[in-house]
């Protein structure tokens, strides 16, 4: 950490407190960790990931949050309104130390134009999902979810493995950068198009990507060689997906699977139109935002049309939750929704059991603390073969960014067991300092997003946004350390509402009680949400877990 007002930020390490308690300290360190140069995409602009997803509204607001957290008593709660600390209230020790609301707008005004106008006026910020809720852990944060998605794809279409299969995708930013490693962990070959060569180089540095090949034909030739030999391999190709995907289709090249994780959710701040360098795009964005959006959407239409073309030629094609289809339709491509989103295609059965992205970070900064938690997870869930494979591969292949952290998908009935075991390890000194447990907002009961997590719900409840609000209220009542409700993450303003919660594992008896309640109730609501929507798998899970649903089965 530095004392400068806009310079490098790094979370404190070790066991010495700079706040009045570990719940406040956990929030402070994770906020700072979000802006660690090893973690954030553009830390000097407070941008963590996802196009323009920020940790705080301004540097002035950031330092005011830091000051407020350091002065916060153990029976007080800090309120953060879209990245700005607005008040501290006396509450009680079990209350969250921080409550956050990011990017929320009244529905009639919930569009990018209005949001940007308010953002320019200094009244709001875009929090994405884990940027503004202070629990981003770098590309690993999405890695296991991406691994699970490609594993489900392999099971459904390719006999349980991606060996000998080529997957084409685009986008190697903070989220999309997980794709090459997730594909190779499933034994496949990844062709990854990225418009910003610096991102390719960063993924190479972090060992998420194996090779960079600038020539398209040479990249395809190398991918086909790896396919024939059954060699897991990932290749980064500099280029614009709106140009490269159609070019591959015109060549008659058909990969086995195609998806995309460019920043299509934001046609102004994220996606780069075809025909522009990064510098030219930045100039156009500033000079003529309206034209920029039109050109970006036209490019997305071509990009999406190529994906439909691959599908028609036999490729398995799916949307990876960035709203490319929605923006492509606005760009004039009427058949944009011809292929499904990844949640209805592969992930919903896991959501029915409350399974989702369970993550934790070592506040000590000591990688040995994460090694101890890895062993604990392996001991707790030896029967979960996919989880065991993930932990073993992650230990070997995943480089920590910022504070050491781990993610794995656990469900209702499992998360609290892991949390309680971690608490025992902190209490006994095996883990040297408290850890923070949190999750992505992409979870089974914490999001309403009709183009992603709640696409195609059985009862038609895709757009019902009560569930993420109930999730935040439930986690607040259960004793979470900090809780956040956001708007627009993943798919853009006007298209999602979602919530997140974190709990500090401090080795105390009170900590154990908080952990058990938060990590039982949070995923259980995901089971309830899907049971209420009519999924029999979720109803069976609710009965097995003893969840009390007054109208279950009626």
Swiss-Prot record:
One of its GO terms (molecular function) is urocanate hydratase activity. NAD(+) binds at residues 50-51, 128, 174-176, 194, 199, 240-241, 261-265, 271-272, 320, 490. Pfam families: Urocanase, Urocanase_C, Urocanase_N. It is an enzyme of class 4 (lyase). It catalyses: 4-imidazolone-5-propanoate = trans-urocanate + H2O. Catalyzes the conversion of urocanate to 4-imidazolone-5-propionate. This is Urocanate hydratase. It comes from Rubrobacter xylanophilus (strain DSM 9941 / JCM 11954 / NBRC 16129 / PRD-1). The gene is hutU.
């Amino acid at each position: 950490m530095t004392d400068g007002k806009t310079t490098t930020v790094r979370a404190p390490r070790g066991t010495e407190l700079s706040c009045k308690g570990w719940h406040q300290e956990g929030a402070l360190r994770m906020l700072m960790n979000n802006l660690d140069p090893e973690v954030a995409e553009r830390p000097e602009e407070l941008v963590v990931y996802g196009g323009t997803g920020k940790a705080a509204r301004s540097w002035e607001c950031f330092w005011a949050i830091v000051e407020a957290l350091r002065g916060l008593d153990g029976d007080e709660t800090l309120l953060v309104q879209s990245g700005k600390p607005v008040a501290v209230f006396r509450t009680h020790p079990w209350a969250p130390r921080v409550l956050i609301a990011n990017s929320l707008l009244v529905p009639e005004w919930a569009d990018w134009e209005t949001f940007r106008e308010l953002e320019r006026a200094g009244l709001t910020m875009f929090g994405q999902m884990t940027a503004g809720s202070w629990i981003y852990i770098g590309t690993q944060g999405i890695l296991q979810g991406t691994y699970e998605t490609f594993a489900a794809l392999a099971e459904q279409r390719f006999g349980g493995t991606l060996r000998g299969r080529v997957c084409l995708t685009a986008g190697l930013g903070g989220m999309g950068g997980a794709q090459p490693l997730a594909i190779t962990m499933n034994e496949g070959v990844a062709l990854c198009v990225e418009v910003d060569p610096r991102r390719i180089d960063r993924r190479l540095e972090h060992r998420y990507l194996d090779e960079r090949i600038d020539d398209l034909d040479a990249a395809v030739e190398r991918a086909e060689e790896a396919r024939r030999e059954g060699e897991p391999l990932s290749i980064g190709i500099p280029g614009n997906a709106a140009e490269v995907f159609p070019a591959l289709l015109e060549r008659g090249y058909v990969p086995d699977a195609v998806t995309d994780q460019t920043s299509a959710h934001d046609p102004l701040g994220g996606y780069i139109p075809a025909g522009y360098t990064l510098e030219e795009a930045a100039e156009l964005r500033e000079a003529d935002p309206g034209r920029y959006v039109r050109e970006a959407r036209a490019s997305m239409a071509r990009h999406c049309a190529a994906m439909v073309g691959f599908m028609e030629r036999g490729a398995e094609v799916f949307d990876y939750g960035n709203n490319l289809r929605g923006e492509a339709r606005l760009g004039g491509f009427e058949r944009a929704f011809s292929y499904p989103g990844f949640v209805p295609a592969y992930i919903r059965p896991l959501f029915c059991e409350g399974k989702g992205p369970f993550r934790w970070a070592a506040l000590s900064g000591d990688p040995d603390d994460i090694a101890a938690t890895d062993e604990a997870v392996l001991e707790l869930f030896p029967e979960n073969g996919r989880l065991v494979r993930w932990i073993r591969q992650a230990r070997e292949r995943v480089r920590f960014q910022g504070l050491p952290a781990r993610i794995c998908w656990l469900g209702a009935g499992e998360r609290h067991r892991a949390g309680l075991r971690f608490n025992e390890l902190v209490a006994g000194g095996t883990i040297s300092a408290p850890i923070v447990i949190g999750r992505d907002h992409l979870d089974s009961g914490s999001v309403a997003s009709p183009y992603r997590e709640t696409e195609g719900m059985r009862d038609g409840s895709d757009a019902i946004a009560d569930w993420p609000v109930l999730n935040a209220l439930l986690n607040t009542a259960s004793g979470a350390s900090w809780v956040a409700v956001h708007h627009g993450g993943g798919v853009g303003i006007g298209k999602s509402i979602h919530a997140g919660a974190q709990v500090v594992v401090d080795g105390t008896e009170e900590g154990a009680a908080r952990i058990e309640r938060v990590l039982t109730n949070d995923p259980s609501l995901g089971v309830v949400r899907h049971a209420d929507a009519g999924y029999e798998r979720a109803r069976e899970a609710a009965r097995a877990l003893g969840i009390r649903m007054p109208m279950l089965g009626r």
